[in-house]
């Protein structure tokens, strides 16, 4: 769903006597999505001595009491004159919400689905890379997993990725935190990129980006 709450529209500025004039003076409401989109991507270093040929993600868990049981459909009201420039529209009407008390459990990723690449670090987001360019590159070259749509929350999103270096091996885990920072966790692409370096060490990189 998409929405926006706009106030102080000067109706007189958008009135015309002709159809052509009306087109030039139309009212444009910049809508935003009411949810965010969470992606996971995984890659592993190639090479005979990389020791990543058997790694796999066994499960992913996002902590309990992170997401409200309900959230506002509309972001905060905003003046028409400034709404179009605000790409971080959000709702601050949290009050004291109740939160989902259970873990969000996501599937693991088998070894065959973890992209083998020469340099996993090359798939971190570049300093000048736009959000859309990065998403296009990751979807094309790495491939995403466990796409999830999330309610807006005023909390950081925390969780763990569990993995094994070999079939039947010890299950290890790595924590991640996607910060809220008071900004919109609505209308956002939330990306967690996990990559296995030489020896099987799992490193994580995460991004909060505009959802174009």
Name what the model sees in each region.
Residues 1-11:
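Short helix/strand-capping turn motifs
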Residues 16-25, 30-32, 37-188, 208-211:
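Tryptophan-paired
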Residues 189-212:
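Intrinsically disordered, low-complexity repeat and linker tracts
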């Amino acid at each position: 769903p998409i929405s926006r709450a706009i106030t102080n529209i000067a109706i007189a500025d958008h009135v015309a006597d002709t159809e052509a004039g009306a087109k030039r003076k139309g009212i444009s409401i910049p809508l935003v999505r009411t949810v965010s989109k969470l992606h996971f991507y995984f890659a592993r270093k190639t090479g005979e001595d990389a020791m990543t040929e058997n790694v796999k993600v066994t499960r992913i868990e996002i902590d309990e009491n992170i997401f409200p049981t309900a959230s506002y459909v509309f972001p905060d009201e905003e003046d028409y004159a400034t709404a179009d420039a605000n790409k971080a529209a959000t709702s601050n009407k949290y009050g004291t919400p109740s939160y989902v008390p259970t873990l969000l459990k996501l599937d693991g990723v088998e070894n065959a689905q973890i992209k083998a690449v020469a340099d996993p670090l090359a798939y971190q987001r570049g300093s000048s890379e736009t959000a859309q360019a990065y998403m296009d590159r990751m979807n094309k070259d790495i491939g995403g997993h466990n796409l999830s749509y999330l309610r807006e929350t005023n909390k950081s999103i925390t969780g763990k990725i569990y993995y094994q270096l070999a079939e039947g091996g010890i299950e290890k885990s790595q924590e991640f935190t996607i910060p809220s920072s008071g900004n919109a966790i609505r209308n956002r692409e939330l990306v967690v990129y996990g990559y296995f370096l030489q020896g099987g060490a799992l490193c994580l990189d995460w991004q909060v980006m505009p959802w174009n």
